[in-house]
Amino acid sequence: MSSYQSEYNADEQAAIDKEFTRLANNKSIYLDHAGTTLYAESQVTAAAEQLQRDVICNPHTCRVTGDYVDQVRFKLLEFFNTKEDEYHVIFTANATAALSLVAENFDFGRQGNFHYCQENHTSVLGMRERVQARAMYMLKEEEITGMASVPSAANGVSGSSPGDNSLVTFSAQCNFSGYKIPLAAIAGIQKQGLPHGLGKKISGEAPQTTDNNNYYVCLDAASFVATNPLDLQRYRPDYVCISFYKIFGYPTGVGALLVSRRGAEAFRKKRNFFGGGTINYAYPHAMDHQLREVFHQRYEDGTLPFLSIVGLLEGFRTLERLVPRRSVNGGDVATMERISRHVHGLAQHLEKQLRQLKYPNGQPLIELYNRVGYEERHRQGGIVAFNVRTDAGPFVGFGEIACVAALQGILLRTGCFCNIGACQRYLGLDETMMDAIYKRAGRICGDYYDLIDGQPTGAVRVSFGYMTRRQDVDELLKMLHLSYLATKPQQRLQLIEEQAGELPKALKERAQRLRPQLLQLAIYPVKSCAAFKIEEGGGSGGGGSGGTWPLTAQGLQYDREWMIVDMNGMAVTQKRCSELCLIRPLIRDDQLVLHFGDSPDGVSLPLSLADQAENSSRCRSKVCRQPVEGLDCGDEVALWLSQHLGLEGLRLLRQSSQRSTTNGVRQQQKLSLVNQAQFLLVNRSSVRSLQFEESLDETVDRFRANIIIDTGSAFEELSYKQLTIGQVQFQVEGPCQRCDMICINQRTGERSPETLTTISRLQSGKMRFGIYISRISTENNKESQHLTCGDVVVVT
């Protein structure tokens, strides 16, 4: 049972619920308060009534409007427990604009550095483009947290000493995970600076010493102040950046930069730009102007969004009315403190329940991303980030979760939440993996490319506001249980497809990709030699227009059409000569070209069977005890093979007569020189579960499959009976019983016996991996079909 206790009494909860009836009317459960909280109905009604009642015009025209704006400044300072003689309030468009203002105007001098936390909003990374620092350093969260224990003056430092200035920027609360960096680090940094060599240098020239530098702190408080009190009497950052819609839900388009008196001293005396309202005068006929004396007036370019600013007053009133101060155990608990308790309690409840969600085999459903747990409110806020796993362990893409949630009316957030550094940290992405995701795979911020080779590129985030109810959290838990623990993957995908028309446009596109897709085709022109791969966008080495490859009556065109035999006419395989895997085929310009390893020199053969037959003698061999008839491909290629493989008397044969076998649906299936069936299918999820210490592509190559797919669950292919890829129907012939050939690394020829033992362990002693499939032939598809990488795989 959960230990959750409501922060609100019954009357308070009823009053809050009355303000958000639109959620029930729209059958919506809102769980993205870190994105924006929701506005109360009475809040926007009162704001609209004021606009209808009062004459609110340009503050340069009407002093009344200016008075309203000043009221908001005073109220904001009171909200953060400070006064106008300690902090200036500069109105901006949002927290991003506030960060930009700091970056543009902070005076680093000649030796000052810019330091920022890895787990920061993208806008902090954007500051790097504008700061004029000598060097830039990325700090890990624990490096900043460590500064909280540095002995320092209780309230930081009051001023600056001669010397240059360094700036440290971090988020009070991580918008990815909800982790709160101890604000005591602010005074530690201001008083002691940062230890020399702390952090990773990203750019610039490291100064010989920073001992004389003054250290300033820019606090990105946008996520934090939405649900937590910020006491600027206790903690005194030099700059505080906020967005009001995070706190009140309405209005949007207005934020603020709070600048301490100390922080103001570190701003440049001259600006690179000035707008209307920021100057005493500016001559058009000469480069002469004078900025305003009042600090905030120098930086509020142009006319302020005064209607939005006036609307903030009702936001403050609404919070204080719906979540009033109350006495607890003789102490006074203010509005934001109560909201902090409320959202933390919900997050704690959710985290405990998520940990209890498990599959029948004991596999946890949820992978949580959290630094310190949910026991301490001063360390963790009302945000829970996670991913979902299958019963076999691989991840489910966050795009699928977004689809399932949307169909249940649950609004949550997926991706990296404009915090790639936190994604990198929590998902364990090294620099190579980051390049693979963003540069090679082409993922961009905000898209739904959620899994790359089974690696999540983001997460699912739920976050809470003062109006979130426990019932909302329980509905999320119910969705996860019913959709994942009580429903099989194929049923879930079918339900999503049936209701896809109800999804937003971006999710409709993601829903279309939920079905497994054909990732890659591989043909092995010469039996037991390397593959020629066909991938989306075109085949390797120029084969397969657009990733498409034709089918013949025997399978994929040119697959296992040639084989190498010894002087006795017996087929040579990798069991006897592992170096066969180094013979790499290339199909182009009506030629089959063979190379050995990375050598540019090779030998060519015509693809046309008619051209080959004119000058070739016929001979016989056997494949799996069945006689086959073939054409000898000549002395040139025979000599080339013997030289590279070190075996005398080798010949290359090309199949000239068809083989056939009876499959499970009692059809005569025509075969090439394959051992058992027309096609071998392998699931990358199953390969991934082996967890070999080599690249996933290398492991996939070991299984020498023709058709490579990727599904949500490892080994689910073993349960298939029939499937359709694109427009082509297939019958499953059964699992592929493996031999020690899979112990050979297909890129090097080296053997590693643990491959077989791992499969045996995962399959309870059985040596099964991949499935044999055959095309279901009809009168309409005998000669005209093809497969294309990207085709959807439907299991029937």
Curated annotation (Swiss-Prot):
The protein's Enzyme Commission number: 2.8.1.9
Keywords from the named record: Molybdenum cofactor biosynthesis, Phosphoprotein, Pyridoxal phosphate, Transferase
MF terms (GO), sorted A to Z: lyase activity; molybdenum cofactor sulfurtransferase activity; molybdenum ion binding; pyridoxal phosphate binding
Residue runs in coiled coils: none
Cofactor(s) demanded: pyridoxal 5'-phosphate
Ranges of residues in domain MOSC: 650-796
InterPro entries: Aminotrans_V_dom, MoCF_Sase_C, MoCo_sulfurase, MOCOS_middle, PyrdxlP-dep_Trfase, PyrdxlP-dep_Trfase_major, PyrdxlP-dep_Trfase_small, Pyrv_Knase-like_insert_dom_sf
Top-level taxon in the UniProt lineage: Eukaryota
Catalytic activity: Mo-molybdopterin + L-cysteine + AH2 = thio-Mo-molybdopterin + L-alanine + A + H2O
Pfam families attached to this UniProt entry: Aminotran_5 (PF00266), MOSC (PF03473), MOSC_N (PF03476)
Modified residues (Phosphoserine): S752
Record: active site: C418
Residues found modified as N6-(pyridoxal phosphate)lysine: K246
Family: Belongs to the class-V pyridoxal-phosphate-dependent aminotransferase family. MOCOS subfamily.
Record function comment: Sulfurates the molybdenum cofactor. Sulfation of molybdenum is essential for xanthine dehydrogenase (XDH) and aldehyde oxidase (ADO) enzymes in which molybdenum cofactor is liganded by 1 oxygen and 1 sulfur atom in active form.
Protein name: Molybdenum cofactor sulfurase
Classification of source organism: Eukaryota, Metazoa, Ecdysozoa, Arthropoda, Hexapoda
